[in-house]
Amino acid sequence: MKLYLVRHGKAEDSVDASGERPLSQRGMADVEAQAKFLDNAGVRVTNIYHSGKLRARQTAEILSALVAPGVALQKIDNITPMDDTTYLAQQIQSWNTDTMVCGHNPFMERMAARLLAGNDEASAVMVKTGTVMCFEKFSDTWVMNWMVVPCLTRDIEY
């Protein structure tokens, strides 16, 4: 099973009428470039989860069009910025298909540290907006196969 952890794309600095921060134009373009890259690499997932916050949901929507066409997006609890990683760590134990989770920092950095070092306080990776990380489980060990930041996919033409 592969687990794709995604930090939402760059959001507007100010909140909209509903009190949420939508993706900025740059954020949308970056996530679209990431989606094209993932599609070209053959990435497909059977589940996409998001935090419920607008910017994470928008990120999931853009990605799902190419890596999970027809798959319904699902909100998952306890993955907002300051949440503890324990809940998601427990949830992924029962997953057996390639899955994507769209969320926020510092949660995504702490979750990556937990998967790689067994400790969410370890300093393992820096996750910029729009970053996609691919983890794979071998026996009881998670490894990071790769990590792609938007500046690498922005200008690629397919």
Task: Give residue ranges: language-model regions.
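Active-site-proximal alpha-helix that buttresses catalytic centers in soluble enzyme cores
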Residues: 2-79, 83-86, 90, 108, ...
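Non-DNA-binding regulatory cores of transcription-related proteins
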Residues: 98-100, 105-131
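Short aromatic-enriched loop/helix-cap "lid" or pocket-rim segments at secondary-structure transitions
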Residues: 17-18, 88, 146, 156-158
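Residue-level signal for well-ordered alpha-helical positions
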Residues: 62-63, 114-115, 138
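Short, well-ordered coil/turn elements that cap or connect secondary structure elements
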Residues: 68-70, 96, 139
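Domain-level recognition of soluble alpha/beta enzyme cores
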Residues: 119-154
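A polyampholytic, Gly/Pro-enriched intrinsically disordered region
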Residues: 92-102, 142-150
